[in-house]
């Protein structure tokens, strides 16, 4: 079996899925205490880096995604599939798991 090299440009989401680069989690508390990796909360904010073509409708057309590349989004805490590429973390989500676009 051949090894596959993954990068952001080689991952193309299908349907209504969205590929999001996860924002860095806080390294320390408001009081200045450094947090170990095990105590950090999973971030729920990230930047959209790839978008699928949209959800197929019954008539064969596609419903265009509401988010686009570059949008900063807030998503459900336990949604999606976590993917690590190099030192960066990503999550592959269904568009319905995105709660809001953050400005």
UniProtKB/Swiss-Prot annotation:
Protein name per the record: Co-chaperonin GroES
Family: Belongs to the GroES chaperonin family.
Taxonomy of the source species: Bacteria, Bacillati, Cyanobacteriota, Cyanophyceae, Synechococcales
Keywords: Chaperone, Cytoplasm
Locations listed in the record: Cytoplasm
Assembly information from the UniProt record: Heptamer of 7 subunits arranged in a ring. Interacts with the chaperonin GroEL.
Top-level taxonomic group: Bacteria
Gene name of the encoded protein: groES
MF terms (GO), sorted A to Z: ATP binding; metal ion binding; protein folding chaperone; protein-folding chaperone binding; unfolded protein binding
